[in-house]
């Protein structure tokens, strides 16, 4: 199977049969598990997060709670005790951020609400924590972010992030 974007899988293990997911130039091989893959083209990394069971990326076996991140240069880093709730928040109808920069926040908002985001003076260095329902209107999301110190101008479907 090949994906673009993000997907969540629950796979039952079958002897002598492997379930493989290709995302960009990487392949995740399932060994009977539940896992999330985030591989949007605009993200700097492909992230595979294990909810339960095990998967194999390259020659590394990942276990529940692990997250493998492969950057655009092909370097892989494995994080143990990953924030599974954050990784699968999208499938539970939420945006969840834990020390996320504005670019991380705005990439998700841009995809969900189909808006174009720009940073004419560069992205602010502020970090964001919290969860926002994906059922909130775009105006509601910006109101929440502005209460956290973010500044924007909005013209139609174009959002300009200000310092």
Question: What spans do the regions from the language model cover?
Answer:
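A residue-level detector for the "anchor" residue at the start of short, highly conserved motifs
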Residues: 1-163
């Amino acid at each position: 199977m090949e994906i673009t974007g993000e997907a969540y899988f629950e796979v039952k293990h079958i002897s002598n049969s492997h379930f493989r997911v290709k995302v960009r130039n990487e392949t995740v091989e399932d060994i009977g598990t539940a896992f999330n893959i985030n591989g949007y083209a605009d993200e700097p990394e492909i992230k595979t997060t294990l909810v339960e069971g095990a998967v194999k990326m390259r020659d590394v076996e990942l276990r529940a709670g692990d997250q493998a991140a492969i950057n655009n240069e092909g370097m892989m880093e494995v994080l143990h005790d990953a924030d599974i709730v954050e990784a699968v928040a999208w499938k539970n109808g939420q945006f969840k951020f834990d020390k996320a920069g504005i670019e991380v926040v705005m990439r998700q908002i841009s995809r969900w609400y189909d808006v174009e985001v720009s940073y004419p003076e560069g992205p602010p260095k502020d970090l964001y924590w919290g969860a926002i329902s994906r059922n909130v209107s775009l105006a509601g999301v910006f109101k929440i972010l502005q209460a956290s110190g973010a500044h924007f101008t909005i013209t139609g479907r174009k959002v300009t992030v200000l310092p």
